[in-house]
Regions:
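Ligand-binding clamshell of periplasmic/extracellular solute-binding protein-like
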Residues: 45, 49, 71-74, 88-101, ...
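Extracytoplasmic "Venus flytrap"
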Residues: 31-47, 70-72, 153-160
Length: 342
């Protein structure tokens, strides 16, 4: 008798669950808040997801992109966390290293990194630091020995353009002056062209994805002095990795641990997040739709045309990583405060 009742109940209520999933997003619009300016590589990845994800969400909602740049995506992250409704209709694309700012206690932070809804990551990419070729800084050793350190440009402390030069100082003794306050990576590149600064750190993927870098490489305007991967990227076979340099300069174990925490941002990559508190069934819908989106044949062709690498990570994996990186002991946090100048 009991099994029969259970079967009847499942038959009666199962369709309504499926119906609710299908109808919630029907005739709705999902807004993807991009924390970087239009045209940046982060923005290109966000728009690519927005273009295709709607067809994999039951109800086929419209998906629009709203750019909200500022302070290395801090403005967008704070907005998604504190203003957007937790209904699954606002998602976002932010830079991956904003957890630094929470760990070191910056007052601008209005979010709890662990409480974001993690939907997925389009790609994992290591970092590089490029240098104008008409400077005397041809190698890391030149930078280490320089009486006057090179100037690198950066948006804010949560951008790789800021923290990678600082990490190189801590781990291998290469000194830099980092000039912050630029609105975007593109603005930093323009500053490099004008001669205001000589260098910038950011992802390998972006360096090989768009202009002006293809033209710069052809003209020899810049060269890459270091990359952060465990092994050399196939596109940069002659550029030393940070692990190689740490071995060469006998970096301490403490500094190697610091590097591991900082470079965890590589694994977070180009994340798509949601507000805290999205109902579990909608989180499931968004995560499943993301995985289907980054496997879509049309999207893969589009990514290839735009020279955008794909190495996706699931929302579940991102959530686990986010929890792990926030569980840092006090000594590591103090080292990060020193590195970030807080």
């Amino acid at each position: 008798m009991v099994p029969s009742i259970l079967i009847l109940l499942s038959v009666l209520f199962w369709p309504f669950g499926g119906y609710a999933q299908t109808t919630f997003y029907k005739d709705k619009t999902i807004r993807l808040v991009a924390g970087t300016p239009a045209g940046s590589v982060y923005d290109l990845y966000a728009r690519m997801v927005a273009q295709f994800i709607g067809k994999y969400i039951p109800g086929n909602p419209n998906v629009i992109v709203q750019n909200m740049p500022g302070v290395a995506s801090m403005v967008a992250a704070n907005y998604i966390y504190t203003v957007a409704k937790p209904d699954g209709l606002t998602i976002g694309s932010i830079q991956p290293a904003l957890y630094f700012d929470q760990l070191v206690g910056r007052k601008e932070v209005q979010f709890d990194w662990k409480k974001f809804t993690w939907i997925g990551n389009t790609t994992v990419s290591d970092y590089l630091l490029y240098m104008r070729s008409d400077t005397p800084y041809k190698t890391v050793e030149d930078i280490r020995k320089a009486a006057v350190p090179p100037k690198c440009g950066a948006e804010g402390t949560g951008s790789s353009a800021y923290y990678l030069p600082r990490l190189l100082e801590e781990t291998i003794g290469a000194k830099f002056t980092v000039v912050t306050g630029y609105n975007s990576g593109t603005d930093v590149d323009l500053a490099v062209e004008r001669g205001e600064v000589q260098c910038r750190a950011f992802t390998i993927a972006a360096f090989f994805a768009r202009e002006p870098f293809a033209t710069w490489r052809k003209k020899g305007f810049v060269h890459v002095v270091v990359q952060t991967g465990k092994k050399r990227d196939a596109k940069l076979p002659d550029t030393p990795t940070l692990p190689e340099l740490m071995d060469r300069y006998k970096t301490t174990e403490s500094n190697r641990r610091l590097a591991a925490v900082i470079l965890a941002a590589n694994e977070i990559g180009r994340p798509i997040i949601g507000t805290p508190g999205i109902p579990a069934d909608r989180v499931k819908i968004l995560r499943e739709a993301f995985i289907k989106t980054v496997s879509d044949a049309e999207l893969l062709d589009d990514a290839k045309r735009k020279r955008l690498d794909l190495d996706p990570v699931s929302g579940e994996e991102l959530e686990k990583l986010g929890n792990e990186i926030m569980a840092q002991p006090p000594d590591v946090i103090e080292r990060m405060k020193k590195l970030l100048g807080t």
